[in-house]
Amino acid sequence: MIEAANSSGQVPRKVKILLTASFFSALATVGQITIVGKQVYDMTGSELNLGLLGLAEFLPLALLSPFTGPIADRFDRRKVFSFALLAEALASFLLFLYVASEPSSVLPIFGLIALFGVARAFAMPASRALPIDWSPDDVVERVVALKSVAFQAGIIVGPALFGFIFVAGASFPYLAAVISYLIANLLLLTVGPSSIKRLATTGGRQAFRDALEGLKFIRKSPVLYGAISLDLIAVLFGGAVALLPAIAEDRLGVGAVGLGWLRAGVGIGATIVAVTLSVRPLRRDIGKSLLTAVAVFGCGTIVLGLSTNFVLAFVALMVLAGADAVSVYIRASLVPLATPEQMRGRVLAVEGVFIGASNELGAVESGLTAAAFGLVGAILFGGVGTLAVVVIWWRFFPALRDVKDFSEVRPDSSEPS
């Protein structure tokens, strides 16, 4: 990070460019996965396949994270993110070609989503560290909130826009994703490399040990370990958003446009909260606020499971997404603030696996439970499970629960990296 002494309290121009690139990347990613989910469900009618779709994206992230974190620490993160964006654009273009051929098999779609997951594995640690690299210490929390705003704006625009584009042609949303990724890449290339000291290039066993440093650092920090594992377990239970294609079709009776608006409702709720946090950041009772937000997320999931009305489902999605935005804001502030600069890529890569696991394995869990107990049973099980997790973490992670202010978690300047 840039020293606060050199800051005027304003977000640097280069950070604003990076946040704009994040918006276009999120627009493409979330819009595309929404349409992929609809097409897979239309072709198979299986909630389980919706879960397996998430697994196809997550497995590359889990397998490659021991390498992508050190790569983000060793090389120019801007270039790493740029190559990843180009790979994502390639995967989207191949999806465009395949869907345009009016396919009857979903297996190639799963393969292309796995390819997309490989690109995401490289993009995640680099893209999440870049805005922090360019941010003065005194604006880091604001930048975290603004990054959430950019991401959630993409979540709003992407599914709604891609839903309308889908009506014009089933393959056209993937072409829109290609264009969005290329715009993000062009923006990224206008930002020069940061002055962060890079990890020395090593090979063999030392490289593997470097990859494990992020995991060891998190495990030794009860605050980070508690916050990240809370997100993993809670969202693992509360992965109902992955079932939106089935909810839209079977519970609410709406088509692609309605599904797009439901998915956009997630972004609307999260954006309202993220914008509020960018103007009025949390200043006290950080730990208790995190646990309370996860509890509200669980309650919103339960309401979604019980709803047969589009408006009520839309509101429930806004509420649970807003609560999730608080959780993401707190965790996304804690992790970079508590991590030495030269370890940030490795730590964020490990956190990325937890995030991916919570979202994608949550999709698998929801798909499996929906196949076994029905759509409503799966969603209610997830909501109740999330509330149970909050009770357990409140009891067994007092260090996290009792965090009052973000400044408490900053590492000593003498701490080795």
Role assignments for model-derived ranges:
Residues 106-117, 142-198, 257, 264, ...:
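Hydrophobic alpha-helical transmembrane segments
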Residues 102, 129, 133, 174, ...:
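Helix-loop junctions on the cytosolic side of multi-pass membrane transporters
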